[in-house]
């Protein structure tokens, strides 16, 4: 049995699609998860959540209270479409407005951590100017988050700008703000030429949550657990021995599968078995 002190969550996109959060949280509870991570991506459907009415926001809060399944984090990837670094002032302003709305939304519904995607640009060519604008955009975003007491946490990415904890720590030191931390993805971290265990140890004290998925070099999504390059047992051991006690989030994109719940159960059992081998079990 996993330790009660190890919060284990599931990504929203692993579960059946839809906008009923009461149903989603009930299913997550049935599957044995402690929390669900919300996605606000670049689609109009998920972006519209940031414009939810007071009644809609209260419905989410009530679903959390009724089920006991938390929604403590948001994966905010909408800035791929509306980059904070855009040379188009209107697009950049829209990106900052998305950040402002996301922080306000988090404050309203109890989300503690907003995971940021470490792209300066996604659909354009990066250069020194986009990197500079990225730093400036982060600085402005963290100032907003500080006032709201919401943590912004940088994901380790499938993109060279932010493909290691060491690189993300550079931004943490540059910003020097307790409301900016790290949210590593052990799959992305392992797919690059990183000393994964050293990187994880270097991040301790700044890591607020961990994404769990498998990857291969150049393949960052939809790699079945056990078929990629991630040494899960060693990663879990390193995090445990380094004193990390925070949440783990199984990241999957099975919402359109024939039976998403079955896919999630299979993955969850696999991950829990590796956690058990790493000594992350409840004392008898």
UniProtKB/Swiss-Prot annotation:
For this UniProt record, the keywords arranged alphabetically read as follows:
Isomerase
According to its UniProt entry, the function of this protein is described as: Catalyzes the isomerization of L-xylulose-5-phosphate to L-ribulose-5-phosphate. Is involved in the anaerobic L-ascorbate utilization.
Q: Report any one BP term from Gene Ontology.
A: L-ascorbic acid catabolic process
In Pfam terms, one family for this protein is: AP_endonuc_2
**What family does the Swiss-Prot or TrEMBL record give for this protein?**
Belongs to the L-ribulose-5-phosphate 3-epimerase family.
The record's induction entry says: Induced by L-ascorbate. Repressed by UlaR.
Query: What organism is recorded for this protein?
Result: Shigella flexneri serotype 5b (strain 8401)
Which leading EC class covers this enzyme? Answer: isomerase
Domain of life of the native organism: Bacteria
Instruction: Recall the taxonomic lineage recorded for the source organism.
Output: Bacteria, Pseudomonadati, Pseudomonadota, Gammaproteobacteria, Enterobacterales
Q: Can the keyword Lyase be found in this entry's annotation?
A: no
GO molecular function terms listed in the Swiss-Prot or TrEMBL record? intramolecular oxidoreductase activity, interconverting aldoses and ketoses; L-ribulose-5-phosphate 3-epimerase activity
Enzyme nomenclature, EC number: 5.1.3.22
Pathway(s) of this molecule: Cofactor degradation; L-ascorbate degradation; D-xylulose 5-phosphate from L-ascorbate: step 3/4
Q: Which InterPro entries match?
A: L-Ru-5P_3-Epase (IPR004560), L-Ru-5P_3-Epase_Enterobacteria (IPR023492), Sugar_Epim/Isomerase (IPR050417), Xyl_isomerase-like_sf (IPR036237), Xyl_isomerase-like_TIM-brl (IPR013022)
Q: PANTHER family per the record?
A: ISOMERASE, L-RIBULOSE-5-PHOSPHATE 3-EPIMERASE ULAE
Protein name in the entry? L-ribulose-5-phosphate 3-epimerase UlaE
Q: Which reaction does it catalyse?
A: L-ribulose 5-phosphate = L-xylulose 5-phosphate
